[in-house]
């Protein structure tokens, strides 16, 4: 029950009741006995409004229903308030007056032998067999409870009498002594397990101090207030102070079995599980750590710990952690109840520094001696992942699992979004260990985390209004947005796609489409989403490149994933191809998802080209002249070829015409014949002008092209049937076809309407004016809305669009296809430019028209239509500027000239040049990526001719073929004769696909085996990809190591020259300046050490300077020579120096070859300057 602070203090809103059922529990806990309850309360986050769970009372089915919550105004409670009025005045705690707290912690004694027996019977009914821990606790409390006659009225509420303060002290000391004894035994066992170097007497003294502190705490309070108020725990029957009693009751029985009770303790046996009461909001208590969080901060941070970790001094680190105090006397140690934020940050930095420097032994010591909380382990995991240390990651995960007794609650990593204590870390919001490992493509660590159950939760949609998203937005909007971006970076990484997806290629396609949509919905982060989309496309491209034979290529490109069958973009992928052509479902899905890199891959293009040519093996290698000759022959013989296929589709000629390239040439020849007929109609209109000038021409003379239009209409209807309406309308060429056909049909309908009107009006009265208008009237007598006017205009527009439709076949040629794509992009830019153009043009149109309307001095200004034409042609320099002159009206003339000049500057100089720049930019983008763009467009053209059917071109497709009649009769026969259930089994849309080397494999295994083979191929490709990525990573690191070694060689040579110059100066007896010389050497040594601090961790108990043999010797010898004023020091000779540098190179190269993952030591402090 959620209550505000005010409600919890005043005791309001306490009427909520919730009955638990079996469905409320998890499957493993369903039907089992339980002794504790974990309740999670949530509500929309409000920054300036506090909330919390005031009181929680859990009752079992055995509780008496006749024991309602007493009202504060009841007699019992009023008497209690009167007896404790003095105490409440001195310590006004709001929760102390609550009836639930009074009844729970100070109950009336009602125990007897019969009640105990009945209670034991009820416990047996609840849990057959051996009694559980909760049942034993209840029975222990009932056995130790005294009879009701022994307890005084004041003690019936669990509050000691003020006249007998000595009775409360033994009750408080007895359980404390026993608790301290048990803790001492446990500490002795732990001390025996510790190494000998870490043994000391500090822990014992610390334990003794804590015991004395607990024993003296009630006395100190009694000295201050005069009377010490104590209560007894109903679980362990121990006596504790009023302030410590709720805290103890919340944790009683968690770490140890119930302690023996004092004879004066009280208990209640009315219920089994009604004794758990928690106060969260009104009482500032330290929460007990639950199973999803580790909270145990005991040690005060020693100031010298960071320096000891930096220097790799393992012994000092162990001494600081085990003693709990600073040996230098900087500060006392010991346990701390409340750790400040600075302390928490210091412990984090210590663990992070040990991990970052690669000190695995020190890291183990920190993890063994300090109990870090979940947030600290979370940040340490991020550091271990960032420095690529799988061993440390494995230790941290094991630490979490050991502390919690189960696997890590991976959802807690996502909940770190609300943890403000990690805002000062070096990692961005929303970055989890798995996300960071995937972003860095650390496959080993990512696989390790996934094996532990870690996952990356996919972010909710942008418009999601759920409780989690609304709280995150209100908590921190920027942090929420950055968390989404970082999560998508992990999901779109190569490691996550490879390891977390069953079909990595399909997952990359779908994620790329999702990121493209997010780029449109969230323009603030469009560059980031576009970069991630490009990463997904590159991954699919690289994964396809892992194929090693044609069988793998066939399995990858010819299967549709199960998850994508419900996607809108997958509509139409079930269409069948011609016999002998694989379905290429995955390739078509890539085209629908706009995966240009994948489609333009050489493997995909090779497959498409081989299918495109079919059995014409010599077509690809033939010259352009030969191809043009074959195309011209097909153009001339197109009618005869179509008739031959119409009569015998299964003949050799029919199978030859089904080859995609010949089908393409056949359809292109048909469309060229259609355009020739359009040109012929235009020429006939010029030669027979007298006939077409009036209404003497017939409908059929002007509508011969309708034969092709009818064929086009039937062709488009079959395409909609095969592809689906949505997939059909997504193609802009199909949209253009719909417009062209609509205009042709409208023009033909208007001509039919005109002929029908003439027939109807002349049938009864042939001499009427209406009949004369529709038959013999001259063109000058026609009305503006005459149907023939509209028909001729529509036919003219449609003829123009029909010729532009010829650009559809241009992608078949490389140069023409690239130009066609560039023109399409330019048209897109011009459409967007027209919006700005119309806004500015309309603004100046209204201004100039309003100036010249009252004067009417010129024909081109003062009228809206004329002014628009004047301004439009002015943009192209086809108008005279003297049109705006009005000499007799000076002011309007000046304003008109000024506006016209500004219009010329804005439109001609600015906007037109901007349009030219936009068009040039679009053309350059296409030209830079011309190969990919052209191959993608050509692939779409190829796939459109792979489909089954649609072999006969227009207009021969409108003739009912014998093949169509045969198929129709076969379907009718099957429907009538084979209507049994055995014949209704649906054939798989994707049967086993034969390879190109084995065409007879169509009668292969079933669909399930084929799908499993496809998944095996995908897994093999992913494994090859991971191995290739690891080899490239090792090669890059090896090259980087070589560069570092080269830099080290140059630095050592410079250092030797400096040493030689110093030797000469000392030998000549010149004046030395030790600080300057020391700073020079320190600078060189610092550079060398910083360059090599990533090559491996230093040895334990060894300063960082001693990890470079050969260089430190020179430094030490030089320091000796500088200290001995006037005495010539003899450092290593040139031969020894060269050998030292060679030793450094060999030694470090061996270390680099043996080191697996080299940590980064960015925070290592140098000690060169002294």
Swiss-Prot record:
ANK repeats lie at residues 300-329, 346-376, 377-405, 429-458. The chain crosses the membrane at residues 628-648, 659-679, 702-722, 738-758, 789-809, 833-853, 899-919. Residues 158-177 have a biased composition (Basic and acidic residues). GO terms for biological process: acrosome reaction; aggressive behavior; calcium ion transmembrane transport; calcium ion transport; female courtship behavior; inter-male aggressive behavior; mating behavior, sex discrimination; negative regulation of male mating behavior. One of its GO terms (cellular component) is nucleus. GO terms for molecular function: damaged DNA binding; diacylglycerol binding; inositol 1,4,5 trisphosphate binding; store-operated calcium channel activity. Residues 1-627, 680-701, 759-788, 854-898 are cytoplasmic. Its main location: membrane. Residues 649-658, 723-737, 810-832, 920-1170 are extracellular. The keyword Hydrolase does not apply. Residues 74-85 have a biased composition (Polar residues). SMART domains: TRP_2. Residues 64-113, 142-231, 322-342, 1118-1170 are annotated as: Disordered. It holds the Pfam family TRP_2. Residues 1030-1068 form a coiled coil. PANTHER family: SHORT TRANSIENT RECEPTOR POTENTIAL CHANNEL 2, TRANSIENT RECEPTOR POTENTIAL CHANNEL. Belongs to the transient receptor (TC 1.A.4) family. STrpC subfamily. TRPC2 sub-subfamily. Thought to form a receptor-activated calcium permeant cation channel. Probably is operated by a phosphatidylinositol second messenger system activated by receptor tyrosine kinases or G-protein coupled receptors. Is not activated by intracellular calcium store depletion. This is Short transient receptor potential channel 2. The lineage of its organism: Eukaryota, Metazoa, Chordata, Craniata, Vertebrata. The gene is Trpc2.
């Amino acid at each position: 029950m959620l209550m505000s602070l005010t409600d919890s203090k005043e005791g309001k809103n306490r009427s909520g009741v919730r009955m638990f059922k079996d469905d409320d529990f998890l499957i493993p806990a369903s039907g089992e006995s339980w002794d504790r309850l974990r309740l999670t309360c949530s509500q929309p986050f409000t920054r300036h409004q506090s909330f919390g769970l005031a009181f929680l009372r859990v009752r079992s089915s055995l509780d008496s229903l006749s024991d309602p919550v007493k009202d504060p105004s009841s007699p019992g409670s009023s008497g209690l308030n009167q007896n404790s009025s003095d105490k409440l005045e001195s310590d006004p705690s709001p929760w102390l007056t609550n009836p639930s707290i009074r009844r729970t912690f100070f109950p009336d004694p009602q125990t007897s032998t019969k009640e105990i027996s009945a209670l034991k019977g009820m416990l047996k009914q609840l849990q057959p067999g051996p009694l559980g821990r909760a049942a034993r606790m209840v029975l222990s409390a009932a056995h130790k409870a005294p009879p009701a006659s022994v307890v005084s009225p004041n003690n019936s509420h669990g509050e000691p009498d003020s006249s007998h303060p000595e009775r409360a002290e033994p009750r408080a000391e007895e359980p404390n002594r026993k608790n301290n004894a048990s803790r001492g035994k446990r500490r002795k066992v732990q001390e025996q397990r510790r190494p000998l170097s870490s043994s000391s007497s500090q822990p014992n003294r610390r334990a003794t101090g804590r015991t004395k502190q607990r024993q003296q705490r009630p006395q100190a309070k009694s000295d201050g207030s005069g009377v010490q108020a104590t209560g007894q725990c109903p679980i362990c029957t121990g006596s504790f102070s009023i302030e410590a009693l709720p805290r103890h009751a919340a944790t009683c029985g968690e770490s140890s079995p119930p302690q023996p009770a004092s004879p004066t303790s009280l208990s209640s046996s009315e219920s089994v599980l009604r004794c758990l009461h928690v106060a969260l909001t009104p009482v500032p208590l330290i929460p007990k750590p639950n199973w999803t969080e580790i909270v145990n901060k005991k040690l005060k941070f020693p100031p010298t710990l960071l320096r000891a970790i930096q220097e790799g001094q393992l012994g000092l680190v162990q001494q600081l952690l085990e003693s709990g105090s600073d040996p230098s006397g900087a500060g006392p140690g010991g346990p701390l109840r409340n750790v400040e934020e600075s302390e928490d940050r210091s412990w984090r930095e210590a663990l992070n520094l040990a991990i970052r420097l690669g000190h695995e032994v020190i890291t183990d010591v920190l993890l063994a001696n300090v109990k870090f909380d979940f947030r600290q382990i979370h940040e340490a995991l991020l550091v271990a992942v960032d420095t690529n240390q799988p061993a440390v990651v494995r230790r941290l995960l094991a630490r979490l699992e050991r502390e919690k007794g189960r696997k890590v609650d991976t959802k807690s990593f996502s909940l770190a979004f609300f943890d403000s204590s990690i805002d000062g870390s070096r990692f961005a919001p929303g970055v989890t260990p798995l996300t960071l490992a995937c972003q860095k493509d650390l496959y080993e660590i990512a696989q390790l985390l996934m094996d532990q159950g870690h996952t990356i939760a996919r972010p909710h949609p942008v418009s999601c209004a759920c409780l989690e998203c609304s709280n995150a937005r209100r908590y921190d909007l920027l942090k929420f947005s950055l968390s989404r971006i970082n999560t998508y970076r992990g999901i779109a990484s190569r490691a996550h796609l490879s390891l977390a997806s069953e079909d990595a290629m399909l997952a990359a396609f779908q994620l790329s489409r999702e990121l493209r949509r997010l780029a449109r919905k969230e323009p603030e982060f469009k560059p980031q989403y576009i970069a991630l989309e490009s990463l997904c496309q590159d991954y699919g491209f690289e994964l396809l490149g892992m194929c090693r034979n044609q069988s793998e290529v066939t399995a990858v490109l010819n299967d549709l994933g199960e998850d994508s069958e419900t996607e809108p973009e997958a509509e139409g992928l079930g269409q069948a191809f011609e016999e002998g052509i694989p379905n290429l479902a995955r390739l078509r899905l890539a085209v629908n998802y706009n995966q240009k890199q994948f489609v333009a891959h050489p493997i995909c293009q090779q497959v498409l080209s081989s299918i495109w040519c079919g059995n014409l093996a010599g077509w690809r290698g033939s010259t352009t002249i030969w191809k043009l000759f074959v195309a011209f022959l097909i153009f001339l013989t197109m009618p005869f070829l179509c008739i031959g296929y119409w009569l015998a589709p299964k003949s050799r000629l029919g199978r030859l015409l089904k080859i995609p390239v010949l089908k393409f040439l056949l359809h292109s020849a048909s469309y060229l014949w259609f355009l020739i007929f359009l040109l012929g109609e235009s020429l006939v209109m010029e030669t027979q002008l007298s006939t077409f000038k009036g209404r003497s021409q017939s409908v059929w003379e002007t509508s011969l092209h309708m034969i092709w239009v009818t064929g086009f209409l039937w062709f488009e209807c079959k395409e909609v049937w095969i592809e689906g309406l949505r997939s059909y309308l997504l193609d802009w060429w199909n949209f253009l076809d719909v417009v062209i056909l609509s205009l042709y049909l409208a023009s033909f309908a208007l001509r039919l309407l005109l002929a029908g009107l003439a027939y109807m009006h002349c049938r009864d009265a042939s001499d009427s004016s209406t009949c004369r208008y529709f038959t013999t009237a001259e063109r000058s007598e026609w009305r503006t809305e005459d149907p023939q006017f509209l028909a001729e205009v529509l036919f003219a527009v449609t003829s123009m669009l029909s010729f532009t439709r010829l650009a559809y076949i241009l992608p078949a040629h490389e140069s023409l296809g690239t130009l066609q794509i560039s023109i399409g992009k330019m048209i897109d830019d011009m459409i967007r430019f027209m919006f700005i153009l119309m806004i500015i043009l309309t603004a100046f149109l209204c201004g100039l028209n309003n100036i010249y309307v009252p004067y009417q001095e010129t024909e081109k200004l003062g009228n809206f239509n004329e002014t628009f034409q004047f301004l439009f042609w002015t943009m192209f320099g086809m108008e005279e500027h003297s049109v705006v002159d009005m000499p007799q009206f000076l002011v309007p003339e000046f304003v008109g000239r000024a506006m016209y000049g500004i219009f010329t500057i804005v439109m001609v100089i600015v906007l037109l040049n901007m349009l030219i720049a936009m068009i040039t930019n679009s053309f350059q983008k296409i030209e830079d990526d011309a190969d990919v763009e052209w191959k993608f467009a050509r692939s779409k053209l190829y796939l459109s001719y792979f489909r089954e059917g649609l072999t006969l071109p227009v207009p021969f497709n409108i003739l009912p073929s014998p093949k169509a009649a045969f198929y129709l009769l076969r379907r009718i026969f099957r429907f009538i004769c084979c209507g049994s259930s055995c014949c209704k089994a649906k054939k798989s849309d994707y049967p086993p696909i034969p390879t190109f080397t084995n065409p007879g494999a169509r009668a292969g295994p079933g669909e399930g085996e084929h799908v499993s083979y496809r998944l095996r191929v995908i897994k093999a490709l992913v494994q090859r990809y991971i191995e290739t990525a690891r080899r490239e990573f090792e090669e890059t690191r090896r090259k980087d190591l070589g560069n570092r070694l080269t830099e080290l060689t140059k630095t050592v040579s410079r250092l030797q020259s400096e040493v030689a110059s110093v030797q000469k100066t000392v030998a000549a007896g010149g004046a030395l300046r030790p600080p300057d010389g020391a700073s020079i050497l320190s600078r060189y040594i610092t550079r060398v050490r910083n360059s090599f601090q990533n090559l491996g961790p230093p040895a334990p108990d060894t300063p960082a300077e001693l990890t470079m043999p050969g260089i430190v010797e020179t430094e030490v010898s030089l320091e000796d020579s500088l200290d001995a004023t006037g005495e010539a020091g003899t450092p290593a000779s040139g031969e020894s120096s060269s050998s030292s540098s060679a030793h450094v190179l060999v030694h470090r190269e061996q270390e680099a070859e043996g080191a697996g993952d080299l940590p980064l030591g960015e925070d290592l402090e140098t000690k060169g300057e002294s």
